[in-house]
Curated annotation (Swiss-Prot):
GO terms for molecular function: 1-phosphatidylinositol-3-kinase regulator activity; ErbB-3 class receptor binding; insulin receptor binding; insulin receptor substrate binding; insulin-like growth factor receptor binding; phosphatidylinositol 3-kinase regulator activity. One of its GO terms (cellular component) is nucleus. Heterodimer of a p110 (catalytic) and a p85 (regulatory) subunits. The keyword Phosphoprotein applies. Belongs to the PI3K p85 subunit family. Binds to activated (phosphorylated) protein-Tyr kinases, through its SH2 domain, and acts as an adapter, mediating the association of the p110 catalytic unit to the plasma membrane. CDD domains: iSH2_PIK3R1, RhoGAP_p85, SH2_cSH2_p85_like, SH2_nSH2_p85_like, SH3_PI3K_p85alpha. Residues 112-300 form the Rho-GAP domain. It comes from Xenopus laevis. This is Phosphatidylinositol 3-kinase regulatory subunit alpha. Residues 3-80 form the SH3 domain. GO terms for biological process: cellular response to insulin stimulus; insulin receptor signaling pathway; insulin-like growth factor receptor signaling pathway; intracellular glucose homeostasis; negative regulation of apoptotic process; phosphatidylinositol phosphate biosynthetic process; positive regulation of endoplasmic reticulum unfolded protein response; positive regulation of protein import into nucleus. The gene is pik3r1-a. Residues 81-102 are annotated as: Disordered. PANTHER family: PHOSPHATIDYLINOSITOL 3-KINASE REGULATORY SUBUNIT, PHOSPHATIDYLINOSITOL 3-KINASE REGULATORY SUBUNIT BETA.
């Protein structure tokens, strides 16, 4: 049986680069079936005559009998032909080689590159302006298109690049059809000077892919690599924005037929842009991207429904005051605390227990609701845009408080059918568990000493592990770089070996005819020496790879050990601080607390002064009123560590403490809440600024900030007023 096909002639010679390619010689005749072109998803009537626009074609070289892929830029169209149809198979996108006879303008176009991602935008922007505009237009016009990213527009390379070079703010991208937009998006990634996922990231991802770990651990490891790799954060921000776009596409997969796998096949060559030596490497890059897309989908697919628009009455509860309560006053709002601390607070709680914290993303105004459901913690992002809040578009709530109040009365099933639970039990930062069981001050003091010793020991162990982890991570990276250098060296030596082998036969035959045995032996000796050197390098590389594998496993064990210690460290610190707070509230002097804590302030000129005689008692020595950060730094510069002042903060209703620590001026916010002044919850319990200053005259600020291991020892104006 025959089918319709097309006939082409090779204009340039081509040497196959991959297993699936075929060789071309000038004048070779090639045939391609119509079914094969249709399977590409980018074929339109009449395009068979323009093979350079189709890209890579799959057909048969009638001169050699080979069947496989060849570049459309290397052939010309001859006409129609009846041929036996092959079985078409889909292929991921592949960049075309430049034809040897291409015009100068085309060659210059190939050399075109966009600015580096780090030059295109800076945080808090979430992505490059052109990329954002392109994706917004694609999602608005072609989210449900069945040919999205699989059809090709008739626009030339120059036209696509004109789109990418334009000012994103002044151009309406919706004027272009969806095929042009999708082509421009793919061209954007090809024209970047460096791939979105650089080789540094890819090598670490490849190592992770070959490890025998669970899928959840693999996803976490990939995300850690993306964030921790030594590349500008604009790269992972761009990747993060693109993954969100893929998530939107997957939501409409029933119409656009795009799955995580198909998207990975299309975009992995564009995002990785690696020169693969085997099909396995190509499969790995596709699998890595598929895992990232699927993890984005799994995290967010539990939120398909939109929240209903709340009625005005839902914001007001029985007491009639919640609708005006600020977020800072809400008992369930914990501010900037870590995920580990959240997990600790929600451990073993009942379904419906919840709290809200600042989101870990860089977007200002976003928050994360953590809810207990089914014995697990569910993380739900609270978005903020144009003064409105919500879990997903459209954002309809006027505040986070209004949003939480609504779902305390209504089930979250309105938002997500899988979350059939109300926000029933807030984890209150005002009502912490009473862990102090002893009833005498001396007994509590002894317990404080015990917990402090345990905390310091555990903290030292964590610090040692962190140093080991940092050291091994650096060594691992150095060894990976060395292995890459070995590969390049081996390649060079093998090329030399092939060259010498090629020409040695001719020279040996020549010298044999001349009877020059000495030159023959010299050639053979050099060849054997070269082979021996290659063997030595290969052995060195193999030993280094074995060492790298062992050290990678060691590094992973250190990381696991650090993660296992962290919850204990948080719990010990929490317990110690609650004992310390209990003693402080009982009126125990700081000198006695320091004895129990093992703190010594031998350099403090006020350590033997009674509290009522301290210069801190005179607010004029440290309260400088309304000055800015620069003025505060000028006042403190050159002073000894522990010299401090308190000023009005740029944050309304709050104050700021500026203090010398390790030779630098550091700044921290002093909160003012209904419970009192303080640096952080649950320490906002001082009735006045003076009371707070007197307390931290003896107590280090390190419990609030690891870089502030200092007390408020010396008021900035103290010596002038003594």
């Amino acid at each position: 049986m025959s089918a319709e096909g097309y006939k082409y002639r090779a204009l340039y010679p081509y040497k196959k680069e991959r297993e699936e390619d075929i060789d071309l010689r000038v004048g070779d005749t090639l045939s391609v079936s119509r079914a094969t072109l249709l399977a590409l998803g980018c074929f339109a009537e009449g395009m068979e005559a323009r093979p350079e626009q189709i890209g890579w074609l799959n057909g048969c070289n009638e001169n050699t009998g080979q069947r496989g892929d060849f570049p459309g830029t290397y052939v010309e169209y001859l006409g129609r032909k009846r041929i036996s149809p092959p079985t078409p198979k889909p292929r991921p996108p592949r960049p075309l080689p430049v034809a040897p006879g291409a015009a100068r303008g085309e060659a210059e176009a190939q050399a075109f590159t966009l600015p580096d991602l780090a030059e295109q935008f800076s945080p808090p922007d979430i992505g490059p302006p052109v990329l954002i505009k392109l994706i917004e237009a694609i999602e608005k016009k072609g989210l449900e298109s069945a040919t999205l990213y699989r059809s090709q527009s008739s626009s030339s390379l120059t036209e696509l690049r004109q789109i990418l070079e334009c000012d994103a703010a002044s151009v309406d991208f919706e004027q272009f059809d969806i095929a042009i937009l999708s082509d421009a998006l793919k061209r954007y990634f090809l024209d970047l000077p460096h791939p979105v996922i650089p080789a540094l990231m890819y090598s670490e991802m490849l190592s992770a892919a070959r490890e025998s770990i669970s899928s959840d651990e693999y996803v976490q490891l990939l995300r850690k690599i993306i964030r921790c790799a030594n590349v500008p954060q604009q790269y992972w921000l761009t990747l993060q924005y693109l993954l969100k776009h893929f998530f939107q596409l997957c939501q409409s997969s029933s119409k656009n037929l795009l799955s995580a796998k198909s998207l990975a096949e299309i975009f992995s060559p564009l995002l990785f842009r690696i020169q693969v030596s085997s099909s396995d490497s190509s499969e790995f890059s596709t699998q890595i991207l598929e895992v990232l897309i699927a993890s984005e989908w799994n995290e967010k697919q539990a939120a398909p429904a939109l929240p209903p628009k709340p009625s005005k009455s839902t914001a007001v509860t029985n007491n009639g005051t919640n609708h005006v309560m600020s977020l800072q006053d809400a008992e369930w709002y914990w501010g900037d605390i870590s995920r580990e601390e959240v997990n600790e607070k929600l451990r073993d709680t009942t379904d419906g227990t919840f709290l809200v914290r600042d989101a870990s993303t860089i977007m200002h105004g976003d928050y994360t609701l953590t809810l207990r459901k089914g014995g697990n913690n569910k993380l739900i992002k609270i978005f903020h845009r144009d003064g409105k809040y919500g879990f997903s578009d459209p954002l309809t709530f006027n505040s986070v408080v209004e949003l939480i109040t609504h779902y305390r009365n209504e089930s979250l099933a309105q938002y997500n059918p899988k979350l059939d639970v109300k926000l029933l039990y807030p984890v209150s930062r005002f009502q912490q568990d009473q862990v102090v069981k002893e009833d005498s001050i001396d007994a509590v003091g002894k317990k404080l000493r015990e917990y402090n010793v345990q905390f310091e020991e555990k903290n030292q162990e964590y610090d040692r592990l962190y140093e080991d982890y940092t050291r091994t991570s650096q060594e691992i990276q150095m060894k990976r770089t060395a292995i890459e250098a070995f590969n390049e060296t081996i390649k060079i030596f093998e090329e030399q070996c092939q060259t010498q082998e090629k020409y040695s036969k001719e020279y040996i035959e020549k010298f044999r005819r001349e009877g020059n045995e000495k030159e023959i032996q010299r050639l053979l000796h050099n060849y054997e020496k070269l082979k021996s050197r290659i063997s030595e390098i290969v052995d060195s590389k193999r030993r280094l790879e074995e060492d790298l594998k062992k050290q990678t496993a060691e590094n992973r064990e250190i990381d696991k050990r650090m993660n296992s210690i962290k919850p204990d460290l948080i719990q010990l610190r929490k317990t110690r601080d609650q004992y310390l707070m209990w003693l402080t509230q009982k009126g125990v002097r700081q000198k006695k607390l320091n004895e129990w804590m093992g703190n010594e302030n031998t350099e403090d000129q006020y350590s033997v002064v009674e509290e009522e005689d301290l210069p801190h008692q005179d607010e004029r020595t440290w309260n400088v009123g309304n000055i800015n950060r620069n003025q505060a730094e000028n006042l403190l510069r050159g002073k000894r560590d522990g010299t401090f002042l308190v000023r009005e903060s740029s944050k309304a209703g709050c104050f700021a403490c500026s203090v010398m620590a390790e030779g630098e001026v550091k700044h921290c916010v002093i909160n003012k809440t209904h419970t009192g002044f303080g640096f952080a919850e649950p320490y906002n319990l001082y009735s006045s600024l003076k009371e707070l200053v007197l307390h931290y005259q003896y107590t280090s600020l390190v419990q609030h900030n690891d870089s502030l291991n200092v007390t408020l020892a010396h008021p900035v104006y103290a010596q002038q007023r003594r």
